[in-house]
Regions:
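N-terminal catalytic cores of peptidoglycan-degrading enzymes
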Residues: 278-359, 450-457, 534, 538-554
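Structural recognition of the beta-strand scaffold that forms the well-ordered cores
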Residues: 85, 92, 230, 237, ...
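Functionally critical loop-and-helix segments that line ligand-binding/catalytic clefts
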Residues: 291-298, 439-553
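Generic structural signal for well-ordered alpha-helices
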Residues: 307, 339, 373-377, 409-416
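Active-site cleft segment of glycoside hydrolase catalytic domains centered on the general acid/base Glu
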Residues: 399-423
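Aromatic-lined carbohydrate-recognition surfaces of secreted/lumenal glycan-active proteins
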Residues: 294-296, 422-441
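Substrate-binding cleft of extracellular glycoside hydrolase catalytic domains
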Residues: 329-399
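Cell-envelope/ECM-targeting effectors and their regulatory/trafficking segments
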Residues: 1-325, 554
Length: 554
C-alpha cells in the first residue's frame, strides 16, 4: 500500500463523492484502473462534462484544449489561486511514483513542477513543467515511463520509446517508456512508417493497410544513405524482437547480418534488403499475405483432384484435422481414403486436433486436456499416424494473460501428462496452435515440442509486439479460396522445416461402426481412469513430476 495513493483516493471520494457522474473509488492505497478512472472522471467534472466516462476521449480532449489551449502552467510563487485540476495532476503523479514533495493541494508550485519535469524527462521529451494535452493523457493512464526490468524491460527498447516520444509524438502520442515491446509500441512503429511515407498525423492510424503497403520503399545498402530514418525504423523493430543492432540511421555490417538472419528465421526470401516481404513481417504478424508458401491447412476432406492441385501449386505439406465437423454436419476429419489421395499427390500431412478451443469456456473444464489428449491419440492411431508424430492442439482465440495462466497452461499440462503415460504407446508429441504469446508460453513451460502459429489475426494482443516462437514449425498467414474441383477454403502456412510431417502412414484397417463404438467406450473408460489417478496424485503435490517420466497403472 502507498500512503500517497491512499490520500489521493480519499481526496477523490471526499471532493467528488456527492457529484453526479463520479461514484467512488476503492481506498486501498494501490494504483490501478479504478483510481486512474476516478481521476479521469474528476477531470471531466472540472471541465464541465456531465456525462462522465472512464475514458480520456475526444470530448475530454476538446474540453481540455478549450480550457487550457497552452497546457496547464506552473503557478508563480505569488499566485495564490487554487484549482482541483492541480490536485488531480498531483494525484496522478503520486500514482505513477513521482513525488510532489507535499500532500494533495490545490496549487501547482515548484514541487509539482519538478515532478512533471522528471516525468517528461523519463518520457524522453524534456522541457518545462507545463502539462500539455499529451502529458495529461499519459498522466491519466496506466502507462509507465521507467524501465520495468523485472517484467522483461530492456534499455535499448526504452531508448527507442523515448526517441519516438521526442520525435514522432504528433503521430503516436506519448507511448510508454518501460522497455517492453507490446501492442501500443507496435502501433506507434507503423505510425512512424506512415509518417515517413508522407501521411498526415490524422491519417497515420497505425493500421497496416493497402495504402501503407503501396508506399513502401525497397532499401538496400546501395540507397540506404538516402533513407536514414527508414533504416532507423527497421533497426528499432529488429531490436524490439531481439535481433540486436546499433540503433542509428546507418546501414552497417551488423545491421545487414541481423536483417539476413531475420529473413532466414522467418523463412522469407533472403534478399538482404528491406523489401515488401521484410517490412510487412517486421511490422505485422502475418507479413505479406501474397507471398508463396510450402505448407497449408484446411478443413476440407481432400479428393484426388484437390490434392493434385495443391501439389501443382507448390505446396508440400498440408495440415488436416483428426476429428470434428465444420458446422453441425460436414466432417473435417482426415480419412483413410483422403490419405491415399494425399500420398498419391506427393504431399505430406501434419495432424491438428480441434473439437472446440475457439472460446475461453472450453478450457475452463479442468478435465478437458485429458479428454482431448485421449481422443486425439485414439483418432491418430485409427488412421495410421506413425510413432513420434506431432499433433497440434488448438487455442483459437486471443487469450488474456490471466486466461493463459488459469486455463490454457493447465489444459496443456493435462495433455502433456497423458502423452507421457502408457496410454501413448505411439509416443506422439504435443504441438500447440495459437497466437505467438500462447505458443511461446506453452512451449516454454515444456508442454509443446513445436508451434503452429496463428499469425493471420494481426489484431490479436497475443500477436502484436511478440516475436515468432523459436520452435515454430508452421506459420499460418493467409486464408483464401483455392481454385480446384471443387474450390475450397485454404490457409497458407510458412514452413520452417522443423516438423517434416507425415509422408508414410502405418497400415490400418478401417473400423466398422460397431468397432468404433467399442473404441469410444474404451476411450471414455481410459479418460475416467486417468482423471481419477490425477485427482489422487494432485493433492500429494506429485502431479508436476509426472510430466517428466512415463506414468503407468492398472
Amino acid at each position: 500500500m502507498d500512503q500517497m495513493v491512499l490520500l489521493t483516493q480519499q481526496w477523490l471520494n471526499k471532493t467528488y463523492g456527492d457529484k453526479p457522474g463520479f461514484g467512488s473509488v476503492i481506498t486501498d492505497g494501490n494504483t490501478g484502473w479504478d483510481t486512474i478512472n476516478g481521476l479521469i472522471r474528476a477531470l471531466q467534472i472540472e471541465l464541465g462534462i456531465t456525462a462522465t466516462a472512464n475514458n480520456f476521449g475526444a470530448g475530454t480532449t476538446r474540453k481540455f484544449n478549450q480550457r487550457y489551449p497552452h497546457g496547464v502552467k506552473q503557478q508563480s510563487d505569488s499566485d495564490k489561486s487554487q484549482s482541483n485540476v492541480y490536485s488531480i495532476i498531483q494525484g496522478a503523479l503520486w500514482c505513477k511514483g513521482y513525488s510532489t514533495g507535499n500532500d494533495i493541494t490545490q496549487n501547482f508550485y515548484g514541487g509539482t513542477g519538478n515532478a512533471i519535469k522528471e516525468l517528461k524527462n523519463d518520457m524522453g521529451i524534456g522541457g518545462d513543467s507545463t502539462v500539455t494535452i499529451d502529458v495529461m493523457k499519459a498522466l491519466l493512464s496506466m502507462q509507465q515511463f521507467v524501465l520495468l526490468k523485472r517484467y522483461g524491460g530492456i534499455d535499448v527498447i526504452r531508448i527507442i520509446q523515448q526517441t519516438i516520444n521526442r520525435t514522432y509524438k504528433d503521430y503516436t502520442g506519448i507511448i510508454p517508456c518501460d522497455g517492453l515491446y507490446g501492442r501500443e509500441m507496435n502501433t506507434a512503429l507503423i505510425q512512424i512508417l506512415q509518417s515517413l511515407e508522407g501521411y498526415s498525423p490524422d491519417d497515420a492510424t497505425g493500421n497496416f493497410g493497402h495504402g501503407t503497403r503501396g508506399n513502401l520503399k525497397t532499401i538496400s545498402r546501395q540507397n540506404a544513405s538516402s533513407y536514414g530514418k527508414w533504416v532507423w525504423l527497421a533497426k528499432a523493430v529488429l531490436n524490439c524482437i531481439r535481433y540486436d543492432c546499433l540503433q542509428n540511421e546507418n546501414w552497417d555490417d551488423d545491421f545487414a547480418e541481423q536483417l539476413t538472419k531475420f529473413q532466414k528465421d522467418y523463412k522469407l526470401p533472403v534478399s538482404g534488403a528491406l523489401d515488401v516481404n521484410t517490412w510487412m513481417s517486421l511490422l505485422t504478424s502475418k507479413g505479406n499475405p501474397d507471398r508463396a508458401a510450402k505448407a497449408c491447412d484446411c478443413a476440407t476432406v481432400l479428393n484426388a483432384q484437390q490434392a493434385k492441385d495443391l501439389k501443382a501449386a507448390g505446396y508440400q505439406i498440408v495440415g488436416r484435422y483428426l476429428t470434428g465437423y465444420v458446422g453441425k454436419s460436414t466432417s473435417k476429419a482426415l480419412t483413410l481414403d483422403e490419405i491415399k489421395n494425399i500420398k498419391n499427390a506427393g504431399l505430406s500431412v501434419f495432424p491438428i486436433y480441434q473439437d472446440g478451443g475457439y472460446y475461453p469456456e472450453y478450457f475452463a473444464n479442468p478435465n478437458q486436456g485429458t479428454v482431448d489428449a485421449q481422443v486425439a491419440i485414439s483418432a491418430a492411431k485409427r488412421i495410421g499416424i506413425p510413432s513420434g508424430s506431432t499433433i497440434y492442439f488448438a487455442v483459437d482465440f486471443d487469450a488474456y494473460g490471466y486466461q493463459l495462466d488459469s486455463m490454457i497452461l493447465p489444459y496443456f499440462k493435462k495433455i502433456s501428462l497423458l502423452f507421457n503415460s502408457c496410454e501413448n504407446i505411439k509416443k506422439y508429441q504435443v504441438g500447440v496452435y495459437g497466437p505467438r504469446l500462447i505458443c511461446s508460453k506453452v512451449s516454454k513451460a515444456g508442454y509443446a515440442k513445436y508451434s503452429f502459429v496463428a499469425d493471420m489475426s494481426t489484431g490479436f494482443s497475443g500477436n502484436l509486439g511478440y516475436a515468432i516462437p523459436n520452435n515454430w514449425a508452421f506459420d499460418q498467414f493467409n486464408e483464401f479460396s483455392f481454385q480446384s474441383r471443387p474450390t475450397f477454403a485454404l490457409d497458407k502456412d510458412a514452413y520452417s522445416g522443423r516438423d517434416k510431417g507425415i509422408a508414410k502412414f502405418d497400415s490400418v484397417t478401417k473400423m466398422t461402426k460397431g468397432e468404433l463404438e467399442k473404441e469410444n467406450i474404451k476411450d471414455k473408460v481410459n479418460i475416467a481412469r486417468t482423471q481419477f489417478v490425477y485427482d489422487v496424485v494432485e493433492p500429494l503435490h506429485l502431479l508436476n513430476q509426472l510430466t517428466s517420466f512415463g506414468l503407468s497403472y492398472n
